[in-house]
From Swiss-Prot:
<keyword id="KW-0677">Repeat</keyword>
<keyword id="KW-0964">Secreted</keyword>
<dbReference type="GO" id="GO:0005576">
    <property type="term" value="C:extracellular region"/>
</dbReference>
<feature type="propeptide">
    <location>
        <begin position="30"/>
        <end position="33"/>
    </location>
</feature>
<feature type="propeptide">
    <location>
        <begin position="65"/>
        <end position="68"/>
    </location>
</feature>
<keyword id="KW-1015">Disulfide bond</keyword>
<keyword id="KW-0379">Hydroxylation</keyword>
<comment type="similarity">
    <text>Belongs to the sea anemone BBH family.</text>
</comment>
<feature type="signal peptide">
    <location>
        <begin position="1"/>
        <end position="18"/>
    </location>
</feature>
<feature type="propeptide">
    <location>
        <begin position="19"/>
        <end position="29"/>
    </location>
</feature>
<comment type="function">
    <text>Neurotoxin that paralyzes freshwater crabs at high concentration.</text>
</comment>
<feature type="propeptide">
    <location>
        <begin position="62"/>
        <end position="64"/>
    </location>
</feature>
<feature type="disulfide bond">
    <location>
        <begin position="40"/>
        <end position="51"/>
    </location>
</feature>
<feature type="disulfide bond">
    <location>
        <begin position="75"/>
        <end position="86"/>
    </location>
</feature>
<protein>
    <recommendedName>
        <fullName>U-stichotoxin-Hau2b</fullName>
    </recommendedName>
</protein>
<keyword id="KW-0800">Toxin</keyword>
<dbReference type="GO" id="GO:0042151">
    <property type="term" value="C:nematocyst"/>
</dbReference>
C-alpha cells in the first residue's frame, strides 16, 4: 500500500505545481527600442544604434545671402560703382 500512496502523492504534487504551457506563437511581445545611452543630443538624431548628424536641424543648409561685389578700394571722387567697375560720373564732377 505504501508504493501506491507514494505514487499518488507524487502525481498529486505534479498536478498542483503544474504550470500552463505557453505557446510562443500566440504570445506577442513588443520589441524594445534600441536606445543609445546617452541619447543623441544637439544636431544628432538616432538611426538604429548610431547618432547621425542632422544638417537641417543645425542650420548648415541655409540660404546664404550673396555678398555684394565691393571694389577695394571703393570708387571715389567723380566715379561710382557699376558691377565690379568704377564708372566716371560726368554730372557729379561738372563736366557737362
Amino acid at each position: 500500500m505504501k508504493p501506491i500512496f507514494i505514487v499518488a502523492l507524487l502525481f498529486s504534487t505534479c498536478l498542483v505545481n503544474a504550470k500552463p504551457s505557453i505557446d510562443d506563437a500566440e504570445m506577442k511581445r513588443e520589441p524594445k527600442p534600441n536606445i543609445i545611452n546617452p541619447p543623441c543630443i544637439g544636431c544628432y538624431y538616432q538611426v538604429g544604434n548610431e547618432c547621425v548628424y542632422d544638417k537641417f536641424k543645425c542650420g548648415a543648409v541655409r540660404k546664404r545671402e550673396p555678398k555684394p561685389n565691393i571694389i577695394n578700394p571703393p570708387c571715389i571722387g567723380c566715379y561710382y560703382q557699376v558691377g565690379n567697375e568704377c564708372v566716371y560720373d560726368k554730372f557729379k564732377c561738372g563736366a557737362v
